[in-house]
């Protein structure tokens, strides 16, 4: 319009003052800065110091913060804090008007692209692969072959164990035990072996019971009697005083094992010390009847059976004994040569009532009581052989 007026003025004849005013106005219009682009956010400008907050306070719009979280809108209407201040990513209420935030310049009102992750793409292995029938058949064949092989291995192991058990030493041991039981059956009665050696030459006698058989070689007519027992008939009588344990029930067996046992026992007794021999034969219980203070002396024409044994060597001398026996034997001279057994057997003295001849037998030393003379097994060079008991009295029953 101004231009049209200017053209009219230029086209017509106008005064010079009007032309000058129009030129100044055009210069002012050209010197004015542009107001800005359309749709662009307005820049925050400093507010005038006298700027007042809108009625009811300023309102902060909702926005997405730097963490991608949505912050809802809020009003700044708390007293003096009536202005929305801060930045686009962090907003708060303040009382300073010049620090007011121009919210039109911010663009974080929509969901950021980096927040929308979405669903990850499906992997290839998640998709079902097509089934191969040929491959499945091959797997089935492998399983069947392995099962059959395992069954065959188990069957072989079982057969091997059965054969080993059938031929094991336990089965052979059972057969051997049966054969041993058959061989242990008792055989025919055999005579006893010969005596185990020369007599020991001692005067030790051990009385046994009457349970020995009649046909025993140790029960012959020339058996030895007790030293202090009267000579008379051999009729058995009731036992008087205690006997050696196990003597009444001992019977001779022809078994070789028992013979070997007797032989070993005799050899051990012969080699043992006198103290061991005394411990082997326990002492008998004392008789309830007390002996007289002094025994009656026999007649001089009778031999003294207590001085020396008939089968003892010539150099044997009986040991001294305390008591009445020592007093009686000390007054008698030692006999240089004892009478032989048949001669000693010929003498008969009246026996005391209740006494009877007992059969003599030794389990450990059967040779001691055999009717053998001292010269049968000994010689002048070897010397006398007799068993020393290392005691004051002889062991008699």
From Swiss-Prot:
One term under GO cellular component: dendritic spine membrane
Biased composition (Basic and acidic residues): 123-136
Domain of life: Eukaryota
Spans through the membrane: 139-159
Keyword Cell division listed: no
Keyword vocabulary terms for this entry: Glycoprotein, Membrane, Signal, Transmembrane, Transmembrane helix
Membrane-protein topology: Single-pass type I membrane protein
Glycosylation (residues): 75
Coiled-coil blocks: none
Gene Ontology BP term (one): regulation of short-term neuronal synaptic plasticity
Signal peptide: 1-38
Entry annotated with the keyword Glycoprotein: yes
InterPro entries xref list: Shisa (IPR026910), Shisa_N (IPR053891)
Main location: membrane
Extracellular domain ranges by topology: 39-138
UniProt xrefs under Pfam families: Shisa_N
Compositionally biased region (Pro residues): 188-197, 288-303
Localisation: Membrane
Main function: May regulate trafficking and current kinetics of AMPA-type glutamate receptor (AMPAR) at synapses.
Family, per entry: Belongs to the shisa family.
Subunit structure: Interacts with AMPAR subunits GRIA1 and GRIA2.
Protein name as catalogued: Protein shisa-8
Origin species: Homo sapiens
